[in-house]
Swiss-Prot record:
This is Leucyl/phenylalanyl-tRNA--protein transferase. Belongs to the L/F-transferase family. PANTHER family: LEUCYL/PHENYLALANYL-TRNA--PROTEIN TRANSFERASE, LEUCYL_PHENYLALANYL-TRNA--PROTEIN TRANSFERASE. GO terms for molecular function: leucyl-tRNA--protein transferase activity. Pfam families: Leu_Phe_trans. Its main location: cytoplasm. Functions in the N-end rule pathway of protein degradation where it conjugates Leu, Phe and, less efficiently, Met from aminoacyl-tRNAs to the N-termini of proteins containing an N-terminal arginine or lysine.
Amino acid sequence: MTRPYAPGYRIPTDLLLKAYASGVFPMAESASDPEVFWVRPETRGIIPLDGFHTPKSLRKTIRKSLFDIRFDFDFEATIDGCAEKREERRSTWINAPIREAYVQLHRMGHCHSVEAWREDQLVGGLYGVSLGRVFFGESMFSKETDASKICLVHLVERLKARGFALLDTQFTTEHLKRFGAVDVPRGKYEKMLAEALKGEAIFFP
């Protein structure tokens, strides 16, 4: 992992979009740390859209229609859900400057959420950045079993339907590998990124 730029306390949206187009993204050491640093990993996590796999057990859950899936219905609640500390996740990298920057990107039409609702309560979701034909997944959360996983399935369905070419997960986890996530070297990723930035795909509406 490299940090190509000096830390800062604010992220201008024009700089943030240029960073994503260059294969760079911001993080913070913790939610309480006011500084932001920039990351350009040696290997990058992606989910090939044509290789996405929905586990059999999850397909059964999806058929039960337990959740109302909404897009961009309450973006700020979704990013706050991702930032919330939980028993299984005691720390988070979403600090105040990051939240502010992504809320602004959402207002500009470059950041979107997929949300799972149940009885008018937000119980899971994810958000990410849309640029060109690329969707950069940022974070997800669940308050009910499988809520964020089902949001991921709906995300991929929308990306395919809307003509997206690349789903960037930044890093891979065992959880994401169950859905087909793979690591690619930085050089290969940046070529894929450059190609996918050609043209425009509309995530919402």
